[in-house]
């Protein structure tokens, strides 16, 4: 066959290549052979393209060398060059991975069926949903519709961004006034729906669709801020996830659907290919951070429990409830343990294999919990409980991931997933679940809690929860959903300006906030908030309407949740009048409470057999008109979870330095000093130290105690003032966060005084946690006497917590009229009054009170029940010594009032306050180290008694004083004294602890007291005396006395100690029970001594 000049040999049909399907598949012109007919000269366009490619390559390499040259020119280290090179390589790797992922995803979507046939042996997760799950259907017809609409959707997006979003961005910040969208293209690759699954829904008036969507688009959106020559944008994006669409409610008019709700059941996966300045987000580290932030933003409005609601008809009812419906149920997740975990810790470069430090992450939707870390354990025991709200069944999954805690990056140990539908079917699921991606198993107990719309079983649930040990939080008995709708006629700001109202809703220590609605006093929020409740009978909902600055309060509302328990179906849907607001200011809310009930045959609610009055029903005289049985009378109280969780904060105000001088004399010509004192404020209490005259470096050494709770946000406020005749001058202030002390347990710091040129304050703060054991009480009393200062009140040895629940069978007025009773609780000089319950003989108070106890052996709780406007209905005196011998130092039962009519149900709980920084905690181990006789004198710390470094000496002293090897008391008894010289304050200190085995001369025991006299002086200036104890042979005093004198003078003195008793009520004569005289020259006062001394008669007064 004749060929034209320039043609090569004709290829055979078998060798004939198919025509490329895409123009980009054509070989480049630069690589084509020259046409022979053209004289062997290359084509012009091909040569120009090759030259341009060479120049471009050379320019790029030159640009890479420019930063290296600049680094050398300015003298930077080669490390900066290497660091920049590492950043570039990391960025390049992330970019290549994203582009490779985009190409693979586009190839999959372009020919899904062919690729599916080729990849049948690929992993299950790479297959489309319609292959993986037989009940998921293909929806090609829907994809064709989306592809047809896609260009018009792009036009709408371009218009929306240019006309709505861009002006909003320009108005948000002055620096963005030149912000504009330069390019908005959704591209030619539309969103694809891989599979569709239809559910019938919970109710007949709704339809559920699960759309398995996959978007691998060539979208390109570019923005520019012309003022700063800044360009950024997106070029390519991937989004994969399951989108649930709910058509609800179905109605009888067009369009037959009232609204469409959309949300992702689980977090979708997102991958964005950035351009321009946003290329920096592809740097390793920033890439994961930016993707996480974007996913958090998407989850905030489009991942359960959040959803997007699109109403299709006007005036749709219950829009807020459609946007935030009630949960389907609650799952209580008990994370118990794990076993057989893999070991990730390696030592000596991997030669020695260690264990792991495992912790677990528990997720359900956007709800995430983290367990504590168990160090060095492959079979950890967590024993933690979490409660999660389940909104959609089926669909949501419980996910547990186990990690090994490391200083740098935590190692993955495995994960497990479980559909919540299986928990719903089983009600209680307790099993070991294998970990995927690792080795080992995790032990979970999963309980499905149903939501009940009546309070019939609330007492049963509370009784069960009371016996359940749960951490980190107590189990919940109910949930509360608050639908915040709108407010009316809120007060205006100063200058009659419209406020920007927002709402804070709080239950105990949980606070949630609404969005702010700007420039209106009639805001509409339409938001929902959810709370877990431990005891709905006693908790309250606190609502604060504020301006968005949080400084101006527009109104407040406190709503006891007990009101909901009597409302129909536990729902309140109404207007609420606001206090501290305008006369017509009100708030519209819908409150829905649901009781959490575990309906399982495994659960047996405990009862107390033999409880007196548990079923106190008068069968002979039933009440007429009652169709239900009388409720059982509870045997024990049911306080809320916060009862008994208080701490005591012990505040040592020690000294200050470099205070400013405020005193002036002669019209300011002569500069004096200051007379400083300290004021403290915490938890609604205030304290004040004594005044130190004329001193810029004062020492107070005072101790204050206050009962505190772990409510966040509390601060100890400390202010220093100069005492003056007219107005006290300010010397500075400082603050300490209470959570810092509660978490650490101890804080000893010099705090810089604020708002003044100079000055600092030395504080020592200690958290005392009550312990339910009396084993350490004696040591606590002794240590308190040692650290007691002369200017401070007596330190507390225990904390008494009282929970007043109710009373029954109180006496009536003349006839059958009920009283309005209330109760008063008194311990020492502290008292608490409960609220008044009107017109009842069986009041329910549900109140608690706490008291500081200084001498638990002698103090008592005095309770009186009174009627408003009448006298005492009954009283009760409870000696605290009964609590000291009770189990766990607690009494929880019915007490009969002294009047004989009426009973009260209360819980009295005592906790011993043991200081962790005085050495008392080690006393239980001290007997094994004590072998010295009574004649040996253990050393005492010569420093001030509050210094924590004296703990070993203090522990040694307690060991010898209370040693069981001590000699028996003499015929007249013994007195226990502690003596030392406090060198920093130049004081001789003596503590009279008590006496034992005193002599009884008459028929009745004596009323002893101790008198101390510093000889040779016999005047009132050196005489000290304890309080008097009634009718006892072993009195306890624990009282401290001080004498100001130099050490050398103290060593020349003698201390005369006399134990006396009043002989009769009418006589001034004192009976001497015994005495002892101590020669201080023979005592090492700098080290100190503490011991028992035998009492002698008046003829033989020498020390022994």
Curated annotation (Swiss-Prot):
Residues 135-313 form the SMP-LTD domain. It is a multi-pass membrane protein; Peripheral membrane protein. Changing residue 724 to A: Loss of translocation to sites of contact between the endoplasmic reticulum and the cell membrane. Changing residue 663 to A: Abolishes location at the cell membrane. Residues 1018-1025 are annotated as: Required for phosphatidylinositol 4,5-bisphosphate-dependent location at the cell membrane. Residues 312-433, 460-580, 627-751, 777-899, 971-1093 form the C2 domain. Residues 60-62 are lumenal. Widely expressed. Anchored to the endoplasmic reticulum membrane by a transmembrane hairpin structure; both N-terminus and C-terminus are cytoplasmic. Interacts with ESYT2 and ESYT3. Interacts with ADGRD1; inhibiting the G-protein-coupled receptor activity of ADGRD1. Interaction with ADGRD1 is abolished when cytosolic calcium increases, relieving ADGRD1 G-protein-coupled receptor activity. Interacts (phosphorylated form) with SLC2A4. This is Extended synaptotagmin-1.
């Amino acid at each position: 066959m004749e060929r034209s000049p320039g043609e090569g040999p004709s290829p055979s049909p078998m060798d004939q290549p198919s025509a490329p399907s895409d123009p980009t598949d054509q070989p480049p012109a630069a690589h084509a052979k020259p046409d022979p007919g053209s004289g062997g000269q290359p084509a012009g366009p091909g040569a120009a393209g090759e030259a341009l490619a060479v120049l471009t390559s050379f320019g790029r390499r030159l640009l890479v060398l420019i930063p290296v040259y600049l680094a050398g020119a300015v003298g930077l280290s080669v490390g900066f060059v290497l660091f920049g090179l590492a950043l570039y390589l990391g960025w390049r790797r992330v970019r290549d991975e994203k582009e490779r992922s985009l190409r693979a995803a586009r190839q999959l979507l372009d020919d899904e069926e062919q690729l599916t046939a080729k990849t049948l042996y690929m992993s299950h997760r790479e297959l489309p949903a319609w292959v993986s799950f037989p009940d998921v259907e293909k929806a090609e017809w829907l994809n064709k519709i989306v592809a047809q609409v896609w260009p018009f959707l792009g036009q709408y997006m371009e218009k929306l961004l240019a006309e709505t979003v861009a002006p909003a961005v320009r108005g948000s910040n002055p620096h963005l006034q030149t912000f504009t969208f330069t390019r908005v293209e959704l591209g030619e690759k539309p969103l694809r729906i891989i599979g569709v699954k239809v559910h019938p829904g919970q109710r007949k008036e709704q339809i559920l669709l699960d759309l398995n969507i996959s978007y691998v688009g060539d979208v390109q959106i570019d923005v520019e801020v012309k003022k700063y020559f800044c360009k950024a944008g997106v070029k390519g994006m991937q989004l994969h996830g399951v989108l649930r669409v709910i058509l609800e409610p179905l109605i009888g008019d067009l369009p037959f659907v009232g609204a469409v709700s959309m949300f992702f059941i689980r977090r979708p996966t997102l991958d964005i290919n950035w351009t321009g300045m946003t290329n920096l987000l592809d740097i390793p580290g920033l890439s994961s951070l930016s993707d996480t932030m974007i996913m958090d933003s998407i989850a905030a409005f489009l991942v359960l429990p959040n959803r997007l609601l699109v109403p299709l008809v006007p005036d749709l009812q219950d829009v807020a409830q459609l946007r935030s419906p009630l949960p389907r149920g609650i799952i209580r997740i008990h994370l118990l343990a794990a076993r057989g975990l893999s070991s990730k810790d390696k030592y000596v470069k991997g030669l020695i294999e260690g264990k792991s430090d495992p912790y677990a992450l528990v997720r359900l939707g956007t709800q995430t919990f983290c367990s504590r870390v168990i160090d060095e354990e492959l079979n950890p025991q967590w024993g933690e409980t979490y409660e999660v709200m389940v909104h959609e069944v089926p669909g949501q999954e419980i996910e547990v991931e186990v990690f090994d805690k490391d200083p740098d990056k935590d190692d993955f140990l495995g994960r497990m997933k479980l559909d919540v539908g299986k928990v719903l079917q089983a009600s209680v699921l307790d099993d070991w679940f294998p970990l995927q991606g690792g080795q080992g198993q995790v032990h979970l107990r999963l309980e499905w809690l149903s939501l009940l719309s009546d309070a019939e079983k609330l007492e049963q649930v509370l009784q069960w929860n009371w016996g359940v040990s749960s951490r980190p939080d107590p189990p919940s008995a109910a949930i509360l959903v608050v639908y915040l709708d709108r407010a009316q006629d809120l007060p205006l700001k100063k200058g009659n300006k419209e406020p920007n109202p927002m709402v804070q809703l709080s239950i105990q220590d949980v606070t949630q906030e609404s969005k702010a609605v700007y420039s209106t006093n009639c805001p509409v929020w339409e938001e929902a908030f959810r709370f877990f409740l431990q005891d709905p009978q006693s908790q309250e909902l606190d609502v604060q309407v504020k301006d968005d600055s949080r400084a101006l309060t527009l109104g407040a509302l406190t709503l006891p949740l007990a009101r909901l328990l009597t409302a129909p179906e536990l729902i309140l849907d109404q207007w609420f009048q606001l206090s501290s607001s305008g006369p017509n200011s009100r708030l519209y809310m819908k409150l829905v409470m649901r009781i959490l009930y575990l309906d399982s045959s495994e659960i047996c609610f405990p009862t107390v057999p033999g409880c007196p009055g548990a079923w106190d029903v008068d069968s002979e005289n039933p009440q007429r008109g009652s169709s239900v049985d009388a409720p059982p009378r509870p045997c024990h109280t049911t306080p809320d979870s916060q009862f008994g969780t208080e701490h005591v904060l012990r505040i040592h105000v020690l000294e200050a330095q470099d205070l400013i001088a405020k005193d002036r004399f002669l019209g300011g010509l002569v500069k004096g000093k200051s007379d400083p004192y300290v004021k403290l404020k915490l938890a609604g209490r205030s304290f004040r130290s004594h005044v130190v005259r004329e001193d810029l470096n004062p020492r107070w050494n005072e101790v204050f105690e206050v009962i505190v709770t772990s409510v966040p946000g509390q601060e100890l406020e400390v202010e220093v003032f100069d005492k003056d005749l007219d107005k006290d001058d300010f010397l500075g202030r400082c603050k300490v966060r209470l959570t810092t002390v509660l978490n650490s347990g101890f804080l000893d710091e010099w705090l810089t005084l604020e708002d003044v040129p100079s000055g600092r304050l030395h504080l020592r703060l200690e958290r005392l946690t009550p312990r339910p054991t009396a084993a350490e009480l004696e040591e606590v009393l002794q240590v308190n006497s040692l650290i007691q200062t002369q200017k401070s009140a007596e330190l507390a040895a225990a904390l008494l917590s009282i929970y007043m629940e109710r009373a029954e069978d109180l006496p009536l007025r003349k006839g059958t009229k009920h009283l309005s009773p209330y109760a008063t609780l008194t311990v020492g000089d502290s008292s608490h009054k409960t609220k008044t319950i009107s017109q009842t003989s069986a009041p329910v108070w549900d109140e608690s009170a706490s008291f500081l106890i200084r001498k638990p052996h002698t103090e008592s709780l005095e309770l009186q029940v009174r009627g408003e406007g009448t006298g005492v209905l009954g009283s009760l005196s409870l000696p605290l010594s009964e609590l000291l011998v009770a189990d766990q130092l607690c009494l929880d039962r019915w007490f009969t009032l002294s009047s004989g009519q009426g009973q009260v149900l209360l819980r009295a709980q005592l906790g011993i306050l043991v200081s962790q920084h005085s050495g008392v905690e080690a006393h239980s181990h001290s007997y094994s180290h004590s072998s010295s006789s009574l004649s040996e004198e253990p050393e005492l710390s010569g420093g001030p008694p509050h210094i924590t470094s004296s703990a070993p000496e203090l522990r040694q002293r307690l060991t010898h004083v209370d040693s069981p090897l001590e000699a028996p008391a003499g015929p007249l008894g013994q007195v226990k004294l502690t003596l030392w010289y406090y060198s920093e304050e130049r004081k001789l200190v003596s503590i009279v602890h008590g006496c034992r085995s005193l002599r009884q001369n008459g028929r009745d025991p004596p009323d002893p007291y101790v008198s101390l006299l510093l000889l040779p002086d016999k005047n009132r200036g050196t005489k000290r005396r304890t309080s008097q104890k009634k009718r006892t042979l072993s009195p306890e005093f624990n009282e401290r006395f001080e004498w100001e004198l130099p050490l050398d003078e103290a060593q020349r003195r003698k201390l005369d100690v006399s134990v006396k008793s009043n002989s009769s009520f009418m006589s001034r004569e004192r009976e001497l029970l015994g005495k002892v005289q101590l020669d201080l020259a023979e005592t090492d006062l700098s080290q100190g001594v503490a011991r028992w001394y035998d009492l002698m008669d008046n003829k033989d007064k020498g020390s022994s």
